């Protein structure tokens, strides 16, 4: 995969003989007679005469008490600020929002999840631009807050380091039959489906509910948060090794301190986010996501981050990289292990080194350490894959990456499937069409969804949903009902990083834009071929065209508020569902 290009960004920066200004922006609020009022305000928050020469570093955090995913961030921010101080900068902490997908799943609240990514990016940009901060350390721990922070870093193009909250420890459920197993939040969604079909008692559901979240941290499997934290490390925007330690691990405080030091050093070297966020860096991130069999949401988020970085990244890049990179990690939701176990065998650097040694990563990409990815790995000397949590390159779980991009008559602009969970390449079945998720859940609860059905849920796209809701409630219920290998679900919405089963999402164009999914009818035959990367509606072309006559999409659900604005601005999932 390395391109063999001439001078890398790291080489170019090292060759520069200019001395960067470590206060490229904050002079606007600290220097000169006319800034008297601004300095007076800054004195009130702790700055003094000796601090006006220091770079001002924004420490932006999505800390809140609503979800365990972000609870460590308040503590970590203190360590970040200590690192900034010790390196000669002055930290200024500020907050932004975060939405818990685990709490907002399966009801109206999920409409607001993806839009929170844009709100986070916009709010960070607003604070940093208004206050003229010189650099940032951005802390997050949840599915949309991680890409939102990275989008902000890419948009601002300042010295910036990302720091992850860390994941939760697995819980232990002791069930009524005497069995004991490790559980994560995904087990709760699947337990609901099993209970609804009479396959699990309410008592066991209650036991699982009480066990799934034993403390603070993001959901523990290779779901969206851990996937995006791993991607951030592979991009070079986080310190090497920082993605995998769990939230309660005190190594996180050291990573936080070093992140604060690193951003000041980036200013001294003149390194900004877009020096790191190159096309090659995104290919590295895609490679790591593919090797982990990570969340399909990474496709959406990496496209959006690249868009903010002014890097041309397309679905075809995911296909190209995914065809070369094997699926190595036996991690949840399809495997047996969680991020804690990945950390125990060396963390994300183990995967990165294995891919680098195989020629599947660009080792010359610059990172927030000021060194290249290859140099970072040489310092760490990560071990080889252990063979259980992470397979060796010559013994992969699948020979190609865990995510496949689809095209075809049902998805002219593209769709995404987590192929890591497929036992066979082809599924052909009969369409059962539902307008939005609730109708499909009702049918499943009624027992009318059966083997061989293709459940089509439409008007759940970025614009038509709005907000491109995740379908974890329905997919968890399908698996819990014992239909996970026998029913295909396809939607213009999204899936949770914890989704398992036969699921195709991000279908574009979406229904509200008159995409082919809008014209599927009950009883139509649909064919998915993962090996060929195709998703097709097996309907005569003339019949299909006749269905388009007089098409009227469903009216918008929201006509006021943030989602009404979002509906007017958001683009296709095929380009990251960005608001450009």
UniProtKB/Swiss-Prot annotation:
Active site: 496 (proton acceptor)
Cofactor binding notes: Binds 1 [2Fe-2S] cluster per subunit. This cluster acts as a Lewis acid cofactor.
Region feature Disordered, mapped onto this chain: 1-31
Reactions performed catalytically: (2R)-2,3-dihydroxy-3-methylbutanoate = 3-methyl-2-oxobutanoate + H2O; (2R,3R)-2,3-dihydroxy-3-methylpentanoate = (S)-3-methyl-2-oxopentanoate + H2O
Residue numbers of N6-carboxylysine PTMs: 144
Compositional bias segments (type: Basic and acidic residues): 20-31
Pathway: Amino-acid biosynthesis; L-isoleucine biosynthesis; L-isoleucine from 2-oxobutanoate: step 3/4; Amino-acid biosynthesis; L-valine biosynthesis; L-valine from pyruvate: step 3/4
The protein's required cofactors: [2Fe-2S] cluster; Mg(2+)
InterPro entries: DHAD_IlvD/Edd, Dihydro-acid_dehy_C, DihydroxyA_deHydtase, DiOHA_6PGluconate_deHydtase_CS, ILV_EDD_C, ILV_EDD_N, IlvD/EDD_N
Keyword annotations: 2Fe-2S, Amino-acid biosynthesis, Branched-chain amino acid biosynthesis, Iron, Iron-sulfur, Lyase, Magnesium, Metal-binding
Residues at which [2Fe-2S] cluster binds: 69, 142, 219
Quaternary structure and interacting proteins, as annotated: Homodimer.
Family classification: Belongs to the IlvD/Edd family.
NCBIfam families: ilvD (TIGR00110), PRK00911.1 (NF002068)
Protein name: Dihydroxy-acid dehydratase
Source organism (scientific name): Mycobacterium sp. (strain JLS)
């Amino acid at each position: 995969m390395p391109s063999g290009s001439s001078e890398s960004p790291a080489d170019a920066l090292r060759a520069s003989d200019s001395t960067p200004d470590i206060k490229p922006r904050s002079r606007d609020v600290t220097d000169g007679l006319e800034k008297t009022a601004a300095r007076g305000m800054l004195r009130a928050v702790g700055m003094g005469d000796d601090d006006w020469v220091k770079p001002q570093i924004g420490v932006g955090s999505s800390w809140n008490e609503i979800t365990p995913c972000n609870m460590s961030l308040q503590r970590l921010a203190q360590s970040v600020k200590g690192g900034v101080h010790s390196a000669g900068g002055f930290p200024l902490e500020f907050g932004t929002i975060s939405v818990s997908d685990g709490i907002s799943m399966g009801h109206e609240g999920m409409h607001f999840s993806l839009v929170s990514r844009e709100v986070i990016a916009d709010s960070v940009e607003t604070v940093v631009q208004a206050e003229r901060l010189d650099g940032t350390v951005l802390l997050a721990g949840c599915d949309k807050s991680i890409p939102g922070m990275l989008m902000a870093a890419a948009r601002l193009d300042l010295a910036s380091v990302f720091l992850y909250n860390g994941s939760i420890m697995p819980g232990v459920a002791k069930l009524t039959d005497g069995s004991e197993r490790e559980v994560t939040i995904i087990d709760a969604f699947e337990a609901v489906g099993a209970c609804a079909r009479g396959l699990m008692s309410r008592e066991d559901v209650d036991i699982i509910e009480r066990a799934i979240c034993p403390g603070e941290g993001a959901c523990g499997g290779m779901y969206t948060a851990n996937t995006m934290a791993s991607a951030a490390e592979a991009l070079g925007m986080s310190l090497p090794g920082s993605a995998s330690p769990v939230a309660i691990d005190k190594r996180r405080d050291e990573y936080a301190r070093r992140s604060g030091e690193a951003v000041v050093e980036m200013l001294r070297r003149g390194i900004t986010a877009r020096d790191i966020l190159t096309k090659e860096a995104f290919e590295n991130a895609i490679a790591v996501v593919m090797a982990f069999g990570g969340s399909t949401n990474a496709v959406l988020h990496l496209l959006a981050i690249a868009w903010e970085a002014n890097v041309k990244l397309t679905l075809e890049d995911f296909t190209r990289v995914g065809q070369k990179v094997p699926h190595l990690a036996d991690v949840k939701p399809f495997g047996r292990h969680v991020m804690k176990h990945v950390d125990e065998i060396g963390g994300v650097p183990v995967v990165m080194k294995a891919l680098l040694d195989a020629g599947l990563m660009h080792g010359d990409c610059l990172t927030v350490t000021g060194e290249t990815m290859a140099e970072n790995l040489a310092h760490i000397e990560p071990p080889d894959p252990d063979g259980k949590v992470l397979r060796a390159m010559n013994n992969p779980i699948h020979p190609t990456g865990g995510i496949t991009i689809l095209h075809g008559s049902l998805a002219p602009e593209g769709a995404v499937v987590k192929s890591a969970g497929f036992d066979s390449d082809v599924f052909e079945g009969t369409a059962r069409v539902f307008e939005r998720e609730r109708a499909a859940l009702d049918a499943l609860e009624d027992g009318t969804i059966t083997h061989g059905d293709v459940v089509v849920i439409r008007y759940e796209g970025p614009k038509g949903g709005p907000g491109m809701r995740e379908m974890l409630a329905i997919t968890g219920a399908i698996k819990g009902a014992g239909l996970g290998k026998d029913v295909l679900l396809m939607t213009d919405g999204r899936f949770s990083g914890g989704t398992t089963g036969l699921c195709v999402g991000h279908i574009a164009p979406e229904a509200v834009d008159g995409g082919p999914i809008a014209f599927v009818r009950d009883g139509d035959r649909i064919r998915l071929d993962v090996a060929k990367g195709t998703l097709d509606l097996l309907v005569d072309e003339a019949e299909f065209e006749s269905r388009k006559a007089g098409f009227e999409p469903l009216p918008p659900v929201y006509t006021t508020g943030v989602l009404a604005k979002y509906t007017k601005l958001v683009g296709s999932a095929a380009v990251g569902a960005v608001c450009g």
